[in-house]
């Protein structure tokens, strides 16, 4: 196992990145973390407020700023790259920030890792693989060969967001082969937990209910996502960073397949609302049907396994967090719903 003393976490003030920083802070006291975050709408200094100090430093800046990245990389022994524009709906309206941050930003970071010969881990998404048929339409009912994503699945991105993440994955692979950069890649399924921006599916529904707004469901809600608690994602990334083989791709998943309708109705039930108290709205353009991850490689090779496997308990904890942290999300709620209203038409 490789040990690190000084790591850079890009996007470490965002949802998944800040949870990773909290994980490192709480479990690896000898590691100093420099968070590099542009603090766009999806980043929040408050996500790190309680741990900023001698062991966690926040640098506000752009991952595509080569001079800043060079300065930070010169003092680091690893870069863990979370920073990304990640909201599919936004990528359909304006793809340009996704190309700039997800592709150009990754290139700048790779060049710094190459220059200083430091470890690089690239955090990516299962959306680079496109989507899968529903379990009921497959001969193996979702468990047969090719019925879940693996590291060998061909890339088939279907949105501007996922295409820029696929492109960034590919340049990481190229920099490993062409320049010997010590890099790994992880592709993860849908995360949930604290600090997630309220434009995302689960926190949007929770905060709608808390705000007296009817939740919204794309289409019929048949689209399936493979949910994983963000804390399990953090331990998976740490396992890859410290034990993963250079040049390899590992998929992080917790066997949490549920369709959107099922998740929304569970949220309503947990919040003491009628299970049908939501509106169907027009579906997202090119909406991927099903995601499902086979994480066998990560589990068998690196000994990782998820701990937060009870989705209902994890969802209850998440609902409790948003209920108790209204000051964290309330100011943005009106603007988020106004943005959705521009493209979503109520069907029922």
Curated annotation (Swiss-Prot):
<feature type="active site" description="Proton donor">
    <location>
        <position position="126"/>
    </location>
</feature>
<feature type="active site" description="Proton acceptor">
    <location>
        <position position="127"/>
    </location>
</feature>
<comment type="subunit">
    <text>Homodimer.</text>
</comment>
<dbReference type="GO" id="GO:0000271">
    <property type="term" value="P:polysaccharide biosynthetic process"/>
</dbReference>
<feature type="binding site">
    <location>
        <position position="86"/>
    </location>
    <ligand>
        <name>substrate</name>
    </ligand>
</feature>
<feature type="binding site">
    <location>
        <position position="190"/>
    </location>
    <ligand>
        <name>substrate</name>
    </ligand>
</feature>
<dbReference type="GO" id="GO:0009103">
    <property type="term" value="P:lipopolysaccharide biosynthetic process"/>
</dbReference>
<dbReference type="InterPro" id="IPR016040">
    <property type="entry name" value="NAD(P)-bd_dom"/>
</dbReference>
<feature type="active site" description="Proton acceptor">
    <location>
        <position position="161"/>
    </location>
</feature>
<protein>
    <recommendedName>
        <fullName>dTDP-glucose 4,6-dehydratase</fullName>
        <ecNumber>4.2.1.46</ecNumber>
    </recommendedName>
</protein>
<feature type="binding site">
    <location>
        <begin position="161"/>
        <end position="165"/>
    </location>
    <ligand>
        <name>NAD(+)</name>
    </ligand>
</feature>
<feature type="binding site">
    <location>
        <begin position="37"/>
        <end position="40"/>
    </location>
    <ligand>
        <name>NAD(+)</name>
    </ligand>
</feature>
<feature type="binding site">
    <location>
        <position position="191"/>
    </location>
    <ligand>
        <name>NAD(+)</name>
    </ligand>
</feature>
<feature type="binding site">
    <location>
        <position position="88"/>
    </location>
    <ligand>
        <name>substrate</name>
    </ligand>
</feature>
<feature type="binding site">
    <location>
        <begin position="200"/>
        <end position="205"/>
    </location>
    <ligand>
        <name>substrate</name>
    </ligand>
</feature>
<comment type="pathway">
    <text>Carbohydrate biosynthesis; dTDP-L-rhamnose biosynthesis.</text>
</comment>
<feature type="binding site">
    <location>
        <begin position="62"/>
        <end position="63"/>
    </location>
    <ligand>
        <name>NAD(+)</name>
    </ligand>
</feature>
<feature type="binding site">
    <location>
        <begin position="216"/>
        <end position="218"/>
    </location>
    <ligand>
        <name>substrate</name>
    </ligand>
</feature>
<dbReference type="GO" id="GO:0019305">
    <property type="term" value="P:dTDP-rhamnose biosynthetic process"/>
</dbReference>
<dbReference type="Pfam" id="PF16363">
    <property type="entry name" value="GDP_Man_Dehyd"/>
</dbReference>
<feature type="binding site">
    <location>
        <position position="260"/>
    </location>
    <ligand>
        <name>substrate</name>
    </ligand>
</feature>
<keyword id="KW-0448">Lipopolysaccharide biosynthesis</keyword>
<comment type="similarity">
    <text>Belongs to the NAD(P)-dependent epimerase/dehydratase family. dTDP-glucose dehydratase subfamily.</text>
</comment>
<feature type="binding site">
    <location>
        <position position="125"/>
    </location>
    <ligand>
        <name>substrate</name>
    </ligand>
</feature>
<keyword id="KW-0520">NAD</keyword>
<feature type="binding site">
    <location>
        <begin position="283"/>
        <end position="287"/>
    </location>
    <ligand>
        <name>substrate</name>
    </ligand>
</feature>
<comment type="function">
    <text>Catalyzes the dehydration of dTDP-D-glucose to form dTDP-6-deoxy-D-xylo-4-hexulose via a three-step process involving oxidation, dehydration and reduction.</text>
</comment>
<dbReference type="InterPro" id="IPR005888">
    <property type="entry name" value="dTDP_Gluc_deHydtase"/>
</dbReference>
<feature type="binding site">
    <location>
        <begin position="15"/>
        <end position="16"/>
    </location>
    <ligand>
        <name>NAD(+)</name>
    </ligand>
</feature>
<feature type="binding site">
    <location>
        <begin position="82"/>
        <end position="86"/>
    </location>
    <ligand>
        <name>NAD(+)</name>
    </ligand>
</feature>
<keyword id="KW-0456">Lyase</keyword>
<dbReference type="InterPro" id="IPR036291">
    <property type="entry name" value="NAD(P)-bd_dom_sf"/>
</dbReference>
<feature type="binding site">
    <location>
        <position position="101"/>
    </location>
    <ligand>
        <name>NAD(+)</name>
    </ligand>
</feature>
<feature type="binding site">
    <location>
        <position position="225"/>
    </location>
    <ligand>
        <name>substrate</name>
    </ligand>
</feature>
<dbReference type="GO" id="GO:0008460">
    <property type="term" value="F:dTDP-glucose 4,6-dehydratase activity"/>
</dbReference>
């Amino acid at each position: 196992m490789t040990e690190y003393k000084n790591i850079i976490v890009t996007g470490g003030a965002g949802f998944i990145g800040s949870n990773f920083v909290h994980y490192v802070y709480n479990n690896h006291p000898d590691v100093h973390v420099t968070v590099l975050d542009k603090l766009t709408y999806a980043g929040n200094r408050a996500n790190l407020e309680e741990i900023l100090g001698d062991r966690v430093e926040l640098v506000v800046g752009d991952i595509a700023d080569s001079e800043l990245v060079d300065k930070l990389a010169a003092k680091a022994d690893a870069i863990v790259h979370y920073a990304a524009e990640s909201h599919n709906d936004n990528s359909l309206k304006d793809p340009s920030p996704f190309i700039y941050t997800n592709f150009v930003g990754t290139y700048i970071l790779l060049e710094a890792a190459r220059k200083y010969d430091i470890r690089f881990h690239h955090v990516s998404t299962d959306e680079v693989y496109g989507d899968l048929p529903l379990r009921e339409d497959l001969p193996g009912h979702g468990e047969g060969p090719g019925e879940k994503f693996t590291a060998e699945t061909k890339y088939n991105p279907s949105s501007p967001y996922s295409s820029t993440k696929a492109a960034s994955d590919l340049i990481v692979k190229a920099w490993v082969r062409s320049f010997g950069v010590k890099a790994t890649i992880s592709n993860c399924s849908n995360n949930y937990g604290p600090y997630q921006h309220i434009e995302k599916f689960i926190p949007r529904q929770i905060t709608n209910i808390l705000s007296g707004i009817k939740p919204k469901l794309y289409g019929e809600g048949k689209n399936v996502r493979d949910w994983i608690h963000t804390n399990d994602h953090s331990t998976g990334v740490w396992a890859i960073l410290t034990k993963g083989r250079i040049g390899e791709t590992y998929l992080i998943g917790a066997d949490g397949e549920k369709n959107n309708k099922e998740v929304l109705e569970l949220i309503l039930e947990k919040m003491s609302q009628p299970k049908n108290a939501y509106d169907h709205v027009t579906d997202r353009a090119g909406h991927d049907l099903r995601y499902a991850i086979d994480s066998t490689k990560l589990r068998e090779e690196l000994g990782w396994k998820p701990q937060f496997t009870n989705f209902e308990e994890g969802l209850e904890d998440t609902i409790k967090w948003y209920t108790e942290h209204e000051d964290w999300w309330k100011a943005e709620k009106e603007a988020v719903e106004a943005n959705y209203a521009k493209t979503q038409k109520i069907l029922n």
